[in-house]
Regions:
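Active-site loop segments of alpha/beta catalytic cores
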Residues: 1-51, 62-302
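Short, intrinsically disordered low-complexity segments
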Residues: 56-61
């Protein structure tokens, strides 16, 4: 099976013999391919970005490629790559998530003193997202990734009680809307969200990407607690920054074991292929993944 076929099987409720691989973002095209986006004229960058995505599918076997947050980008990507990779649409503003530094104090004050005001904003956010989803499907989106960072490294951005009031009802609506469009949806969230997972799982969302080791998230425990979930992650990005071969290979084996082989799992980093990652780190990560896949395929009965 191709990576695309494996991912299609997972999204339809099945389990491939070995997990597919893709990443939410790829930002080392210059280091890996010699392709310098900063040297490309603005009007030529959409075509440049598609060329990069073709390279990652052809050379790394990605099962999906970023469709983006914009309907035009989703359509452009689907038209160019839809025959060889799935194209998810991204949405990042449908619910409240971790506020930026300059807004943090104001958000905290409103959370305790003006909850009605926040609820009105939450309603508007959700409604805008629900308008976007059918447009994205019409543009060719095969599934959705909602990018809502709910956690800092040591704790969620709000208490479980406030999360249940301010996020869960709207996230549930978002999931229901996407399911009504016959699409699946995966949550991307960095950080420590252990105390939120029961509430997130109860929304009906289909999967969870990141399972962030820097946020003290244990993929073995998450898999044990939510065996039906599609999990995606969680090779530690801080480890990839350091290019420590033994540590990277150990992290890959942990992901493939517990994520993992024989389960509804997508192999990836705990975030993305970020700018500044040494290309050798990604090569090591892929090499160990491919070695495990080859071992599984060799040992499988005919």
């Amino acid at each position: 099976m191709t990576g695309k076929q494996k991912l299609e099987l997972i999204l339809s409720g099945g389990v491939p013999d070995t997990p597919p691989h893709w990443e939410l973002v790829f930002q080392i095209q210059k280091e890996m391919f010699g392709m310098d986006r900063s040297a490309v004229a603005k009007e030529d960058r959409p075509a440049f970005d598609l060329d990069v995505l073709h390279r990652v599918v052809d050379e790394f076997g990605w099962a999906a490629v970023r469709g983006g947050y914009d309907v035009a980008e989703i359509k452009r990507t689907k038209d160019s790559l839809g025959s060889k990779a799935l194209v998810p649409a991204y949405e990042g503003d449908g619910v409240f998530w971790m506020p930026t530094g300059e807004n943090m104090v104001d958000f905290a004050v409103r959370l305790y003193e003006r909850m009605d005001e926040l609820q009105a904003e939450a309603r508007a956010k959700c409604d805008r997202a629900k308008e976007f989803f059918p447009q994205a499907v019409d543009a060719g989106a095969d599934f959705f990734v909602v990018t809502y960072d709910f956690g800092y490294n040591d704790a969620p951005f709000i208490s479980p009680e406030h999360f249940g009031q301010l996020v869960v009802p709207y996230l549930t609506e978002i999931v229901e809307t996407i399911h009504d469009l016959d699409r699946k949806v995966i949550l991307h969230s960095d950080g420590c969200i252990r105390v939120l997972l029961d509430q997130i799982h109860a929304t009906g969302i289909d999967g969870y990407q990141s399972v962030d080791p820097q946020g003290h998230m244990d993929i073995e425990q998450v898999r044990r607690d939510y065996p039906d979930w599609i999990l995606m992650g969680n090779v530690a990005c801080n480890m990839l920054q350091d290019a420590d071969e033994a540590s990277i290979r150990t992290s890959v084996r942990n992901c493939m074991t517990h994520g993992g082989v024989g389960k509804r799992y997508i192999f990836s980093t705990s975030n993305c292929i970020f700018a500044g990652m040494p290309p050798e780190s990604y090569r090591i990560m892929l090499d160990e993944y491919r070695r495990i896949v080859a071992e599984c395929e060799t040992s499988s009965p005919e």
